[in-house]
Amino acid sequence: MKVSYNGLWKILIDKNMNKKDLAKACELSPATISKMGRGEFVSMEVLFRIGTKLDVDFGDMVSIIKQGK
């Protein structure tokens, strides 16, 4: 399985923010933002900080992509 952060990227567009703004607002490292851009897993703490700052739920930011067998 893979993870998609497309919901988060859409939220950023709606809030007129970019990834650099997100990193600064949530105190995230560039490496964490890069991992998310590549669809890699990040910690629940990171998702919690983002959700709290942007006032959104996990499901609004992240979706699971099921891969074929």
Residue ranges and their predicted role:
Residues 20, 31, 59:
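Key DNA-contact positions within bacterial/archaeal DNA-binding proteins
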Residues 28-41:
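Recognition helix of helix-turn-helix/homeodomain-like DNA-binding domains
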Residues 1-18:
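A short, Lys/Arg-rich alpha-helix, primarily the initiator
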Residues 55-69:
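Short C-terminal boundary/hinge segments that cap the last helix of small helical domains
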Residues 12, 23, 51:
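The alpha-helix within a helix-turn-helix
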Residues 39-52:
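Short, basic-rich loop-to-helix N-cap that marks the start of a DNA-contacting helix
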